[in-house]
A protein has these predicted regions:
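Short amphipathic alpha-helical segments
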Residues: 16, 119-123, 157-160
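PLP-dependent enzyme catalytic core of the Aspartate aminotransferase-like
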Residues: 135-188
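Short hydrophobic/aromatic beta-strand micro-patches
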Residues: 21, 124-126, 162-164
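Conserved core segment of the aminotransferase class I/II
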Residues: 1-86
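Conserved glycine-rich beta-strand-loop-beta hairpin in the small C-terminal domain of fold type I
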Residues: 61-65, 69, 82-97, 101, ...
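Non-transmembrane alpha-helical segments in soluble domains
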Residues: 19, 69-72, 97, 101, ...
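Short, solvent-exposed loop/turn segments at secondary-structure junctions
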Residues: 7-10, 24-27, 73, 129-130, ...
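Short, solvent-exposed loop/turn elements at beta->coil junctions and helix N-caps
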Residues: 6-7, 109-114, 149-151
Length: 188
């Protein structure tokens, strides 16, 4: 199953929207355990759509669906270079991560199995032995907002930072504040 999030691939800021791609073979496969669990035919595709997606999603307006479909069409027809549009987030993440790591922070999720995690909209940082909640609270005193990794289901201490609101004039300020953070929170 390949799930494509509109906010991740197109940086779409509207309603949350995604598409799930399932091969015909998987879609048409019968699983007795699914039939027993969901009380239906047990055919993966039917169960996935009618008993799983339907129950866990709230739906989306038709205009958003048509807009997302048009973005997908334009991308596959070569009219929309969506990768170029989101490269700015990678540039921001690279600069922000350097500021953090230059000041004693470490990247929590730097590898996906054996491959380095690419820079993008979000990245994760930790600091010493601080829990995610502690780090979140302390960063707020320095004007940095984040979310604790614990709220994302992670068992790792740290926070998730977002690049979306970063602007050129904020990098020097961030650098100054993270230097102050390091001085106020010496690592042993």
């Amino acid at each position: 199953i390949l799930m494509l999030s509109s906010s991740k691939i197109f940086s779409y800021a509207g309603q949350r929207m995604a598409v799930a791609c399932v091969s015909d073979k998987l879609f048409d496969t019968h699983y007795p355990a699914l039939a027993e669990r969901y009380g239906d035919s047990g055919v993966f595709g039917q169960t996935f759509v009618a008993s799983v997606l339907y129950m866990i999603t709230s739906g989306c307006t038709a205009s958003t669906q048509y807009g997302y479909a048009e973005m997908l069409r334009a991308a596959t027809d070569g009219e929309l270079d969506f990768a170029a549009d989101v490269r700015e987030y990678a540039r921001r993440a690279e600069r922000m991560k350097k500021i953090f790591t230059d000041n004693g922070f470490h990247i929590v999720y730097d590898y996906d199995v054996t491959r380095p995690v690419g820079d993008g909209f979000f990245f994760t940082v930790g600091y010493g032995r601080m829990s995610g909640g502690e780090l979140l609270r302390e960063l707020l005193y320095y004007g940095v907002s984040s979310i604790s990794l614990e709220t994302t289901g992670s068992g790792q201490p740290g926070v998730r930072a977002c690049t979306s609101r970063m602007r050129e004039e904020l990098y020097p300020l961030m650098e100054e504040r993270m230097k102050a953070f390091r001085l106020d929170h010496p690592l042993s």
